[in-house]
């Protein structure tokens, strides 16, 4: 958790650089940046699942493709606070809510909740 919030601090400490990266006329730069973060996040998630012997993949609750989609959606949302020049205190509030939302979903994937068929 501390590492995550340190990354938010880093983004806001280097806000102008991130704003340039995320909104530059070269869309491929942002897409490549996002893709690299998502790939790293997805790889770490898959390693965690293997190391913890979680059955999310073997049960079919998670596929590498779904992991990629969820990670991409999260980081895209996280970077929207920069794209829209959101003040840090407001961004932190929104990101906390996003994390609670995604945490509930990941719990369902990791531990199953019986709602997979609904």
In which residue ranges do the predicted regions lie?
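Helix-rich interaction surfaces within compact, conserved domain-sized segments
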Residues: 56-61
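Generic alpha-helical secondary-structure signal
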Residues: 2-3, 94
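Short, hydrophobic secondary-structure boundary micro-motifs
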Residues: 19-22
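C-terminal peripheral helix-coil segments that are non-catalytic and often amphipathic
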Residues: 13, 43-50, 67-118
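Amphipathic alpha-helical packing segments from all-alpha helical-bundle domains
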Residues: 3-13, 28-54, 65-72
